[in-house]
């Protein structure tokens, strides 16, 4: 065995804690980033928050002071740009610049209001407390409400409710009586045993002289399965109703709510703060970061200056360490926002037809298209478009919304799957309710427009729009 020494020259990019921080900030949503920055403000005395007015007035003075102070404290230079554009799969899985351009007025910015929510059970219990129940009936009512799911239906039988109460003196009839009272709470039809029970309870609240009410009750009571299958021919035969009468009765039934519990807001609301604002100015689409969505950070110059003057080595080291962390955080934030703005502007430029004319004009676009245009890695584009939202005259969209697969057209071109989905929705909206378009017919109509897609693909697009198949869309006209 021969031993020896070899010299090998290689280049390797070190994953520093600062670079890890920059990449992590890139992935955070606005709400998550707000929390992150607030924690930094709370823990680092060298960081402070400033508003836009103060930032504009003091920027030049700060820059001069910062250069003198920081150079004296720390000779190590920071890079001009953080190398965020890399595939760092091993890192994490899940004042800042706002760009120059349009000056948004306060009354032009979108307002995003929070909302309070309560569960269906809380809402029902509030009504129980306002209802003159006896103590026994109130206990029964509580057990019934506990058995109601979010759609408004009982999850267990009345017999099981009787058993769960655990009182031998409470019988089935008493529970049924309380149940009937709760079913007339708001929303009417809640705590129903099944769909038939739910619809009949709602129908019972109509005035007796309501037109077609008896015919509607007959259909719900005895022929709900035929109605569910839109088998109107069989319905006319078994009910012996004329077509016009059947149509009116069905319309009355369709005015009822099959899931009354869902009319009550449940769960936590989802808050969305747009990161990017888009508007048209002088025939040009202008893209700006939402400067109001994040706090602006700066170095506290008074504390920074103490790093040289303090005689306590421990205090001096504490100040220098926090100063360096503050500088890196501000730099990381600037890199994040610069990347977000570049990518957003590129997306808007590529999808101008969408902003001008709507979904049907969405262009097919994948991550690689934007990555190539801005000269970044696809993984960077994926991070910066996840949980980042754009506000435009057409609404609020996650940046990922603008990416879609392509479908070949007859002329050798490509169409976006998003555009095809919008076209399917448009065709169905214009169909004859008595003869709704089947998936095969939709496929043919798309083919006539030069879009070549399989029937199963059309079915997938229709289902993604929550549109039922043609046999369930059929209506009497």
Curated annotation (Swiss-Prot):
<feature type="short sequence motif" description="RPON box">
    <location>
        <begin position="454"/>
        <end position="462"/>
    </location>
</feature>
<keyword id="KW-0240">DNA-directed RNA polymerase</keyword>
<dbReference type="InterPro" id="IPR000394">
    <property type="entry name" value="RNA_pol_sigma_54"/>
</dbReference>
<feature type="DNA-binding region" description="H-T-H motif">
    <location>
        <begin position="366"/>
        <end position="385"/>
    </location>
</feature>
<keyword id="KW-0731">Sigma factor</keyword>
<dbReference type="GO" id="GO:0001216">
    <property type="term" value="F:DNA-binding transcription activator activity"/>
</dbReference>
<dbReference type="GO" id="GO:0000428">
    <property type="term" value="C:DNA-directed RNA polymerase complex"/>
</dbReference>
<feature type="compositionally biased region" description="Basic and acidic residues">
    <location>
        <begin position="50"/>
        <end position="79"/>
    </location>
</feature>
<feature type="region of interest" description="Disordered">
    <location>
        <begin position="44"/>
        <end position="81"/>
    </location>
</feature>
<keyword id="KW-0805">Transcription regulation</keyword>
<comment type="similarity">
    <text>Belongs to the sigma-54 factor family.</text>
</comment>
<dbReference type="InterPro" id="IPR038709">
    <property type="entry name" value="RpoN_core-bd_sf"/>
</dbReference>
<dbReference type="GO" id="GO:0016779">
    <property type="term" value="F:nucleotidyltransferase activity"/>
</dbReference>
<keyword id="KW-0238">DNA-binding</keyword>
<dbReference type="GO" id="GO:0009399">
    <property type="term" value="P:nitrogen fixation"/>
</dbReference>
<keyword id="KW-0808">Transferase</keyword>
<keyword id="KW-0804">Transcription</keyword>
<dbReference type="GO" id="GO:0016987">
    <property type="term" value="F:sigma factor activity"/>
</dbReference>
<dbReference type="GO" id="GO:0006352">
    <property type="term" value="P:DNA-templated transcription initiation"/>
</dbReference>
<keyword id="KW-0548">Nucleotidyltransferase</keyword>
<dbReference type="Pfam" id="PF00309">
    <property type="entry name" value="Sigma54_AID"/>
</dbReference>
<dbReference type="InterPro" id="IPR007634">
    <property type="entry name" value="RNA_pol_sigma_54_DNA-bd"/>
</dbReference>
<protein>
    <recommendedName>
        <fullName>RNA polymerase sigma-54 factor</fullName>
    </recommendedName>
</protein>
<keyword id="KW-0535">Nitrogen fixation</keyword>
<dbReference type="Pfam" id="PF04552">
    <property type="entry name" value="Sigma54_DBD"/>
</dbReference>
<dbReference type="Pfam" id="PF04963">
    <property type="entry name" value="Sigma54_CBD"/>
</dbReference>
<dbReference type="InterPro" id="IPR007046">
    <property type="entry name" value="RNA_pol_sigma_54_core-bd"/>
</dbReference>
<dbReference type="GO" id="GO:0003677">
    <property type="term" value="F:DNA binding"/>
</dbReference>
<comment type="function">
    <text>Sigma factors are initiation factors that promote the attachment of RNA polymerase to specific initiation sites and are then released. This sigma factor is responsible for the expression of the nitrogen fixation genes. The open complex (sigma-54 and core RNA polymerase) serves as the receptor for receipt of the melting signal from the remotely bound activator protein NifA for the expression of the nitrogen fixation proteins.</text>
</comment>
């Amino acid at each position: 065995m021969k031993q020896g020494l070899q010299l090998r020259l290689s280049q390797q990019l070190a994953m520093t804690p600062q670079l890890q921080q920059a990449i992590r900030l890139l992935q955070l949503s606005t709400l998550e980033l707000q929390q992150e920055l607030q924690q930094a403000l709370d823990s680092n005395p060298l960081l402070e928050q400033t508003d836009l007015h103060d930032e504009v007035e003091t920027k030049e003075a700060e820059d001069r002071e910062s250069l003198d102070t920081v150079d004296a404290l720390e000779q190590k230079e920071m890079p001009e740009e953080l190398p965020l554009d890399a595939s760092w799969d091993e890192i994490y899985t899940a004042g800042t610049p706002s760009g120059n351009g349009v000056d948004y007025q306060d009354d032009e910015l979108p307002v995003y209001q929070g909302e309070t929510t309560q569960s269906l059970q809380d809402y029902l219990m509030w009504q129980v407390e306002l209802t003159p129940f006896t103590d026994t009936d109130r206990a029964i009512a509580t057990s019934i409400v506990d058995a109601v799911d979010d759609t408004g239906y009982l999850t267990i039988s009345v017999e099981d409710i009787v058993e769960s109460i655990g009182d031998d003196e409470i019988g089935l009839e008493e529970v049924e009586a309380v149940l009937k009272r709760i079913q007339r709470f708001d929303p009417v039809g809640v705590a129903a045993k099944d769909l038939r029970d739910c619809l009949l309870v709602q129908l019972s609240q109509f005035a007796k002289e309501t037109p077609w009410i008896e015919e509607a009750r007959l259909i719900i009571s005895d022929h709900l399965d035929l109605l569910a299958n839109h088998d109107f021919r069989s319905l006319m035969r078994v009910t012996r109703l004329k077509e016009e009468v059947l149509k009116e009765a069905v319309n009355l039934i369709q005015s009822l709510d099959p899931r009354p519990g869902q009319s009550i807001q449940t769960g936590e609301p989802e808050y969305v703060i747009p990161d990017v604002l888009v508007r048209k100015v002088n025939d040009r689409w202008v893209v700006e970061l939402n400067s109001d969505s994040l706090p602006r950070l700066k170095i506290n110059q008074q504390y920074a200056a103490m790093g040289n003057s303090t005689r306590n080595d421990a205090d001096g080291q504490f100040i220098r360490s926090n100063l360096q962390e503050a500088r890196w955080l501000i730099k990381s934030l600037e890199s994040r926002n610069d990347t977000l703005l570049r990518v957003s502007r590129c997306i808007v430029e590529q999808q101008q037809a969408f902003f001008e004319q709507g979904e049907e004009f969405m262009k097919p676009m994948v991550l690689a298209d934007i990555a190539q245009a801005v000269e970044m890695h696809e993984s960077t584009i994926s991070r910066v478009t996840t949980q980042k939202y754009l506000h435009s005259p057409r609404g609020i969209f996650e940046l990922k919304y603008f990416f879609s697969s392509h479908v070949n057209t007859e002329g050798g071109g490509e169409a976006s799957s998003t555009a095809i989905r919008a076209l399917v929705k448009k065709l169905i909206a214009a169909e004859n309710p008595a003869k709704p378009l089947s998936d095969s017919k939709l496929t043919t109509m798309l083919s006539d427009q030069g879009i070549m897609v399989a029937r199963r693909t059309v079915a997938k697009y229709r289902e993604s729009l929550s549109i039922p198949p043609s046999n369930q869309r059929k209506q009497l006209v």
